[in-house]
Amino acid sequence: MAAAKWLIASLAFASSGLAFTPEDFISAPRRGEAIPDPKGELAVFHVSKYNFDKKDRPSGWNLLNLKNGDISVLTTDSDVSEITWLGDGTKVVYVNGTDSVKGGVGIWISDAKNFGNAYKAGSVNGAFSGLKLAKSGDKINFVGYGQSTTKGDLYNEAAAKEAVSSARIYDSLFVRHWDTYVGTQFNAVFSGALTKNGDKYSFDGKLKNLVQPVKYAESPYPPFGGSGDYDLSSDGKTVAFMSKAPELPKANLTTSYIFLVPHDGSRVAEPINKRNGPRTPQGIEGASSSPVFSPDGKRIAYLQMATKNYESDRRVIHIAEVGSNKPVQRIASNWDRSPEAVKWSSDGRTLYVTAEDHATGKLFTLPADARDNHKPEVVKHDGSVSSFYFVGSSKSVLISGNSLWSNALFQVATPGRPNRKLFYANEHDPELKGLGPNDIEPLWVDGARTKIHSWIVKPTGFDKNKVYPLAFLIHGGPQGSWGDSWSTRWNPRVWADQGYVVVAPNPTGSTGFGQKLTDDITNDWGGAPYKDLVKIWEHVHNNIKYIDTDNGIAAGASFGGFMVNWIQGQDLGRKFKALVSHDGTFVGSSKIGTDELFFIEHDFNGTFFEARQNYDRWDCSKPELVAKWSTPQLVVHNDFDFRLSVAEGVGLFNVLQEKGVPSRFLNFPDETHWVTKPENSLVWHQQVLGWVNKWSGINKSNPKSIKLSDCPIEVVDHEAHSYFDY
């Protein structure tokens, strides 16, 4: 047990002035969602922690007492990949990645109060996850997902024959998606059953592929799809899953459907909201998500957008009757927020939904028959909601959330009542010592068209009588936001504790402030958003005395990387001592090399060949813009970023070098659009923070700050400088 002490929360402590370092950030325990048992007494959650000395990330599972917040270790077995309550007291079903079947997984059953006394119910012949269970007579029906072969079998990579050639051949899109070249395998939902024999359950290894019979369907949909893309009715007889429209080009359109299919696969799945279908509300052709059955299984709620090629359109709640041809109903359709998840109360009368609102992921309730103009009510909680589950059959929910000041917030929330705190990581984990909400505040500034929100994040031990350089962080998306939530990549508090005050703006294009602000960035990437940033910088410069803009820096990733590249060629670029561009576009016409064409075709009002002028309008490589470049810039771009090719970063660095602008190129050949591997993340922080600290003067004012020399990776430097006079 001593070796597993990190699995349990340590004793609470008082706040101190110690800085939050990248090592603290990366090695802090990471906790998954807490899922309560059927009675609402215990919850189980996954936890892992990276160890820099051993270069590993051991993991395990904990139990959370829902009465007093106490945490205990359930298991330290890292091979246990998921645990689900069996629906029978404290019994659980879990998946073990080590199995007698090569490449397969084991299905085990145990009791949370005596986890070591487990037995194996059976094996699954391949990688399998996302279990959902429901009693059906004397059986327990389940669904989960894995990769499917073209024939419909569960794909087992370990058993697959080695290809004689590395060639890839394509007749349609996608060729590659986010970080992977698309192959013949695809995600599919499979169904099976646990059969009771005496006091034990067994699984015969037989699975039914519910997706493959629908040609070109896929569920969960990559790269972000998971168990939220499907659901199992309470009687275990019907399955709902989301798939992109099989008959439409997936790279060009976002249209997706909710399919219904018998658990036993006796009929082929059929969509309930097919485009222009008899049940589908007129004009609704966008992406569907979050299907969930009502407690009695007679209705299904889901979310859907209207526009067929816009991934950031507003989601609206829809409810369909199962086994009926009645039209689908839209619920609270005029609410100017975009729900992200929906669940039914135990009596089926109330819907609980999460939605981003003013840079915070909030929980709301509304009647299941709410009219179009109904405004959902907020349920009080701290931070942003990641997931929520009902506590027994009550109206209370167990929220797993986080914030800018804590990476895990477990709390119970009840409509009309104050929230009840169970466990907040910043009050327990030594790595998060000193973090709290007092160092964070909102800022509202008149932007190009409307008031624009930003977060101000102050360093540990902040003194209002001192002056701190500005760290101006620009978010990606562009339809995204800096929310009151924890980031495991770009974390404002890590930047602040180098000695900066962070200003993290949510300019035009941001989500959570009404759909108009989100939509207004369309075909205007370098227009209103840039003007918003200028106005925010000017407000900070003129009004906030403790922020030193003369020694400020700016950094951003994805769209934020584009904006940094755009700023380099604008007047605002001369206001910063250093810039950091991570995976940002450089040449306007290169956008055609992306994967999801619907994204660029929406944001630039047409295809690459029909609306070329729109792609070129916000081209950071224009000669008249490049002529202004002079601010030192770090460029980060990774080989497995298929959103925009690594050539974008190399090209940007080429020009910076030939221009004689102090610059550096950071590349990870094994990373994607993001840097996620712990050791790579540490190097990323050493290089990025070391770069800005060098030019902002932080290295001189804060001797403990990160320096470029802290990074052990040898720098490639074959010549004094690339600049020469033609």
UniProtKB/Swiss-Prot annotation:
InterPro entries: 6-blade_b-propeller_TolB-like, AB_hydrolase_fold, PD40, Peptidase_S9_cat. GO terms for cellular component: extracellular region. The keyword Metal-binding does not apply. It holds the Pfam family Peptidase_S9. It is found in: Secreted. One of its GO terms (molecular function) is serine-type endopeptidase activity. Residues 269-291 are annotated as: Disordered. Belongs to the peptidase S9C family. This is Probable dipeptidyl-peptidase 5. It comes from Trichophyton verrucosum (strain HKI 0517). The gene is DPP5.
